[in-house]
Structures are given as C-alpha cells and as structure tokens.
Amino acid sequence: MISFIVPSYNNLQHLKNVYASIQKHEPQAEVILLDDGSTDDTWKWIQEQDCIKYRSETRVGHTILYDKGIELATNDIVGILHADMIVGPNYVANLVKHLKPKTVVCATRIEPPLHPEGKEKIIRDFGMDFDTLDIKSFEDFVNELQLVEGQTTRGMFAPWILYKEDFQAIGGHDPLFAPFPYEDSDIFQRWIMAGYELIQSRDAFVYHLTCRGHRWNEQVGRDDDYYKTVSQRAARNYLRKWGSWIKNDELQYPIINPKYNIAYVIKACNLDLLSALEPWCDMIYIEDEMGVLQAAYYETEQRNTSYDLKKRVLTIEYNDPKAENDIVVEFDAKQFTQQSYNIIQQLSEILKESGEVGEFEVDVFKITINSLTEYQNDLIVCNN
C-alpha cells in the first residue's frame, strides 16, 4: 500500500531505529533503504534486511536519493522518512485518511528541545540521541494525543506522503540543490503552484532527533564543514532560481513571491559585490570591457552552479539592458549600503505591492519597469 524511502549517510544506529519503528507499527509497508556512500557499516547492515536496497558509491545527498527511492517503489503511495526519525502508532492510517490525488500529507514532528518552538511541531524530550530514546514514553504520549487530536492544519515539512504519479508529474526534486539543502522548500512551492493541496495531519506523529542525517553528523548542535559548504551553494542556487528567499507562515506553509525578470546595471562594480548580488537577479551588467572581472568570477563560481554564468554576467559596453529585460535596476556600487542590500532582498515583494510600468527611484536605485510579467509558473516542472 505504501513505500517508505529512507536515505542514510553514516547513520547506522539511527537507521536501525527508524527501520525498527516501521517494522513495529507498519509491518506491511515496503521499505527502500538507500546508502549514500557511507563509510561505516551501513551498507553491510542494509544488505541483511528484507527490503529494497540501493547504494550510491559516492555521496550524492538525499536530494538525489529520495527520487531514486521513489523510482524503485512498487506502491502507488510513497513517503519519505529521515534516518533520525522514528514513527509512532497509527502513523500510516492517520496520514492516508487525508490523502487523495494531487494532495501531499505531512506528519507532525515531536522533537527534543534543540530548536525554537513552532506551531507546526511539538517540543517534548524523549531522548537526545539514538542511544537515549525513551520509545515507550514517546508511544504512550502519541496514544494520548490521538485520543483528542484528529484535525489538520495547512503546512508542510518532512516527513510526507503522496501518490507516486503526482511526485513524478512535476519531475521530482530539482538536482540543482544536490546534495542538499533547500530542495524541500523548492518542491513545496512547486507543489502549490501545480495545484496540489498541502495538509498536515495532527495525529500522525514521528519523533525527530533533527539534523543527524546531513547537518550534525560529527557533533550535535555543530554544523559539519561539508554542510556549511553545500548549504551556501544551495542557497545561492535557490536565489538564482526563485529570485527571493524562502518565506513561510507560522505553520510552515510556503508564501510564494512572484518571480520577475530583473537585471542589475552596476557602475564601478567589484568582485565582492558581484559575488553578493549575482544570485539575486537574472542578469547583471558591469563595466568590464576587457572581461577581467567576469573571468575572475567565472573561475571561482561556475563550478558551484548549473546556471551558465556567461549568460548571466554581461558587460554594459556590449549590451542593452533595457531592451533585454523586463525590470532594470541601475546604481553606483560606491553608493551601495546595507540599506540598499535590504531593499534588494525585498525587491520582489516591493514590486508586487507597488510596482507599475515606468521609472522610479528608491535609495540608490533607478528602477525601470518595462513589464511586470511573472515567471514562477515556469518553474513548476523540473526537467533536469
């Protein structure tokens, strides 16, 4: 009836716990365990289990492995789980009762006090690591909650389930964000724009230790160096794709800003400012007749993105920004301040609320609007 996809990287003890919880509460479920190039005994242990198995010889990240697992799934309904989660009683039943085509249903997380509180989750300490879990107390707590819970709210976070064909209809996760993170915020927005309903079941529960699968592999509460590197890269690619940063309401339901075609025209630009601003626009025009600044930027940044930076970073001398773009933002780098940067970060919201065709000035910017065409719907289907 349902297939669970569980990737893991060097998280064998956590993986054993989540697998045991599935076997206990959902023994009929199909389980797909995927080893992300682990260097511990993860793959050896996976091979001993009665499940669908897959191994990547190198670390590719859960952005890729979720999709591989869903490809391997033989059931119509698929769901993901993190290796550092355990499922509670009645987990599948309390998700599936809300499921229909073009719907994504997520569970409610119960987490130890490691992160700020939120209305989309419950903070309760049932153990801080794989070897201190109080599973009986967690299950008793879930059984108590299920006597009174039952409603839904509108929000989205892992773990979730949906129909396999609905997942594949929009092309799955975008490998632009491999290995991780931000692939989740990207696909949540694409689901909404594709017309899917996002529901959170308030009586389907997991206990989630948080961040052990990809962020805190070495020490709880401290980001791994690898995570810092790939997180920065993914964040810059998210901005290139969407033109604005992630925004959610208090229940973690995505708030989607318009995606406009925006170009910056910068006088006296330097390499640091080019690096800071290039992801926030579609095209950036600089004074660089000899191409020295462009070449230096390509050398350091092109390896971090599948976007062709030679099509994004252009010279003022050989191009006509106003003829090539819907919205053109002109300014002098010497006048650019932190306040200016704050405006850049909010520009899509400013344009949505008060933009109109014509010219206007704000802070150090001269803004020319030729069109307010929105392009976010072009991002729904991932064809990579």
Task: Kindly label every feature range from the protein language model.
Residues V78, V328:
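Short aromatic/hydrophobic "clamp" motif used to bind/position activated sugar donors
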Residues A20-A29, A276-M283:
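Short, acidic, metal-binding catalytic loop of nucleotide-sugar glycosyltransferases
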Residues L34-K44, T58, D288-Q294:
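A conserved acidic beta->alpha catalytic loop
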Residues I86, T153-P159, Q168-V206:
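Donor nucleotide-sugar recognition loop
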Residues I2-H14, V18, H25, L34, ...:
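A conserved hydrophobic helix/loop-capping motif in glycosyltransferases and polysaccharide synthases
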Residues I86-D129:
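Conserved donor NDP-sugar-binding/catalytic core segment of glycosyltransferases
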Residues F141-E165:
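A recurrent flexible, glycine/aromatic-enriched loop bordering the glycosyltransferase active site
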Residues S56-A73:
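Glycine-rich, basic loop-to-helix element that forms the pyrophosphate-binding segment
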